From Swiss-Prot:
A Pfam family it matches: Cytochrom_B_C
The UniProt record lists the keyword Hydrolase: no
Keyword terms, alphabetized: Electron transport, Heme, Iron, Membrane, Metal-binding, Mitochondrion, Mitochondrion inner membrane, Respiratory chain, Transmembrane, Transmembrane helix, Transport, Ubiquinone
Protein name: Cytochrome b
Record's miscellaneous remark: Heme 1 (or BL or b562) is low-potential and absorbs at about 562 nm, and heme 2 (or BH or b566) is high-potential and absorbs at about 566 nm.
SUPFAM superfamilies for the chain: a domain/subunit of cytochrome bc1 complex (Ubiquinol-cytochrome c reductase), Transmembrane di-heme cytochromes
Annotated function: Component of the ubiquinol-cytochrome c reductase complex (complex III or cytochrome b-c1 complex) that is part of the mitochondrial respiratory chain. The b-c1 complex mediates electron transfer from ubiquinol to cytochrome c. Contributes to the generation of a proton gradient across the mitochondrial membrane that is then used for ATP synthesis.
Predominant location: mitochondrion
Length: 379
């Protein structure tokens, strides 16, 4: 009798994706983050669903409904902090996943890469709207600053901002639509993840060497299921440690003050995972220029396959590209730090230099390094 997992229409799809999937035998722990992102998405959807059962998207009661969740709902505090810190874990995994893709040349699988960039944008949009929902000071002012960026668009800017707000300022209409969008986007993300995996399984996984490994592939189960379970246990351990011992470590104290349109916080800043882009936005004195730089700082990922000039797929055997990759990483960490600092003397110029270096590395230096390495191959 043929095994049901190989014949049943639904089981067959799962079998080909999770059990009998031919996988390179040498992929390292950097390949764990795809499955960890799936786990993060499941955690976020489940905790978010329970939070939505008690949350009220109204300017008068939103803040107190979050307080009610933490104080009166059974384990409400745990669900709330798992959701908030789960977002941080999501972005840590996301950035490592993208970094691994850049380092090992995963962007040569163009459809998978482009859907990945689209997923990144959607996760960022979801996280931004989620940050607005508790209706604290930073929620309100963060939403005001970011939505106001649309007004930099010539001619239609002001109309567009009012259309997003649903009025002449951020109010109940804005909060309600942000809640609705924040609720539905994760399900759209889930659908896109399926497409992302579909395209990945068309070409098969890359591996650290960047060399096709069709000669020696191994089944996904049991080898990589065990490896992924270990990664999942570590992720859950870190998330629980963060949630139970330092739930507010990555948050902003200003968000424990109810939103007040008449009182501006001394330093408006987004969550830590957006600080690098925020630093790039602030480093340009012109409003439209800043918005374009902000967009380009993320959308630059779409152009990476076109900027690829190397004959070797992976950076494993390319020391010059490796050096530039690690400089890029330190530059991003510097931008993240600067994004959290006030706009004053040393930080302004540092932010501008770090922003220039960011674009210079990706658009100019890395393609040139690849060309030099191509020349060295012929020696």
């Amino acid at each position: 009798m043929t095994n049901i997992r190989k014949t049943h229409p639904l089981m067959k799809i799962l079998n080909n994706a999770l059990i009998d999937l031919p996988t390179p035998s040498n992929i390292s722990s950097w390949w764990n983050f795809g499955s960890l992102l799936g786990l993060c998405l499941i955690i976020q959807i489940l905790t978010g669903l329970f939070l939505a059962m008690h949350y009220t998207p109204d300017t008068l009661t939103a803040f107190s409904s979050v307080a009610h969740i933490c104080r009166d709902v059974n384990y409400g505090w745990l669900i709330r902090y798992l959701h908030a810190n789960g977002a941080s874990m999501f972005f840590i995994c996301l950035y490592i996943h993208i970094g691994r893709g850049l380092y090992y040349g995963s962007h040569t699988s163009q459809e998978t890469w482009n859907i990945g960039v689209l997923l990144l944008l959607m996760v960022m949009a979801t996280a931004f709207m989620g940050y607005v929902l508790p209706w604290g000071q930073m929620s309100f002012w963060g939403a005001t600053v970011i939505t106001n960026l649309l007004s930099a668009i010539p001619y239609i800017g002001t109309t567009l901002v009012e259309w997003v707000w649903g009025g002449f300022s951020i109010d109940k209409a804005t909060l309600t639509r942000f809640f609705a969008l924040h609720f539905i986007l994760p399900f759209i993300i889930t659908a896109l993840v399926t497409v992302h995996l579909l395209f990945l399984h068309e070409t098969g996984s890359n591996n650290p060497t960047g060399i096709p490994s069709n000669m020696e592939k191994i089944p996904f189960h049991p080898y990589y299921t065990i490896k992924d379970i270990l990664g999942a246990l570590l992720l859950v351990s870190v998330l629980l440690t963060l949630t139970l011992f330092a739930p507010d470590l990555l948050g902003d104290p200003d968000n424990y003050t109810p939103a007040n349109p008449l009182n501006t916080p001394t330093h408006i800043k987004p969550e830590w995972y957006f600080l690098f882009a925020y630093a790039i936005l602030r480093s340009i004195p012109n409003k439209l220029g800043g918005v374009l730089a902000l967009l380009l700082s993320i959308l630059i990922l779409i152009f990476i396959p076109m900027l690829q000039t190397a004959k070797q797929r992976s950076m494993m055997f390319r020391p010059l590209s490796q050096l530039l990759f690690w400089i890029l990483l330190t530059d991003l960490l510097t931008l993240t730090w600067i994004g959290g600092q006030p706009v004053e003397h040393p930080y302004i110029i540092m932010g501008q230099l770090a922003s220039i270096l960011y674009f210079l590395l990706i658009l100019v230096l890395m393609p040139i390094a690849s060309l030099i390495e191509n020349k060295l191959l012929k020696w």
